[in-house]
Amino acid sequence: NVRAFVKDDGADEILAGYETYQAYFIHQAYRRLPSWFRHHLLQPLVDRLPASDAKVSWDFKLKRFVAAGDLSSEDAHGTWRMIFSANARARLLDPIKNSPQASADVLNLYRATFAQTNARHALNRMLYVDTRFYLPNDMLVKVDRMSMAHGLEVRVPFLDHRLVELAARVPPNLKLKHFRHKKYLLKAAMQGRLPNKILWRRKQGFNI
């Protein structure tokens, strides 16, 4: 008899819940390392790490991080959001090469979205981009299609425009505390309301 349910989409994008936000600032330091050190020592070591079948494993994260070592930090953020590399995408879409999907340059779409924001802090710039681009084109579309296929209505309270506007005014250090604690403000607000084993557990994700 259920006709509507609540989904938590949007919290990661407005309150900094992804590891890529931490990776962005690490990447800025990584790019300052000597090129020979990155290309001839670190990258070969990371490339030799054995592949793991674990969900979003450490070797996968490191390889994606290092592969973006020569990009700007904003471009790196865009590539970390992609599932397929440009070459893999071209091979997969070759049979339909004349389609808009095959010709789309996803990285340029990210750059265009970054150019739309006048936020000064890097974290707020990323949150804007992910809210405007990643959230509607990846997260929300999956939920919308699955729910509509079963005649269900999904409500997303974290995307209430008043909450989104409030989150945009919150200082970045209350979203990503000491560049370590993701969604810090939300977790602090829920302290004592949710068990710690739920509140502070590692992010599970919903990968498809």
Predicted regions span which residues?
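Active-site rim elements
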Residues: 122, 151-154, 173-177
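PAPS-dependent sulfotransferase catalytic core
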Residues: 194-208
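Short, charged, surface-exposed loops that flank catalytic or proteolytic processing sites
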Residues: 177-184
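Short, conserved phosphate/pyrophosphate- and ester-handling motifs at nucleotide-, phospho-/glycolipid
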Residues: 160
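Glycine-rich active-site loop/lid subdomains used to bind and stabilize high-energy intermediates
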Residues: 1-151, 197
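Short, solvent-exposed hinge/capping segments at secondary-structure junctions
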Residues: 164-168
